[in-house]
Design a protein with these regions (language model features):
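Active-site-proximal loop/helix of nucleotide/amide-processing enzymes and allied scaffolds
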Residues: 1-135
Length: 135
């Protein structure tokens, strides 16, 4: 394990986007290092079935919350995905869940494209996905 982040590359079945448990791993790493004050160094990266994604913590110590690695969160997220993924796709489904259900802020989603460019994927207040190229 990298001291600042975690990479997840084992695919037992097609994985399309992060889950609450992945968010929990990120939050736990940050919580352990809460006194460092430099939260921008923490991330979780995964190779998903539709690309490589990174979650990066961009919040403050007030945004650190753990406890999302439970079966209850897993089951609820699976049900949520069954309802919304066909309509919204996985990026929008995940970001909506993060904002509306988990009520988390201070976490940014990035997609590493096949041409090695990186886009920050954000959700507007009108629930539209915006992909902003990173410099």
């Amino acid at each position: 394990m990298n001291p600042d982040g975690v990479e997840q590359s084992e695919l037992k079945q097609p994985v399309r986007i992060f889950t609450p448990a992945d968010v929990d791993v990120l939050m736990k790493v940050i919580n352990i290092n809460r006194n460092s004050g430099n939260f921008a160094d923490y991330y979780v990266t995964m190779a998903a079935s539709n690309g490589t994604y990174t979650l990066k913590f961009t919040g403050t110590s007030a945004d650190i919350r753990v406890g999302y690695g439970t079966d209850e969160w897993k089951d609820h997220f699976n049900d949520y995905c069954k309802t919304w993924k066909k309509k919204y796709g996985f990026e929008k489904t995940f970001l909506t869940y993060l904002r509306d259900v988990m009520q988390l802020s201070g976490i940014s989603l990035y997609k590493i494209n096949s041409n090695d460019t990186i886009d920050q994927v954000t959700l507007t207040v009108n629930n539209k996905i915006i992909k902003t190229p990173c410099p």
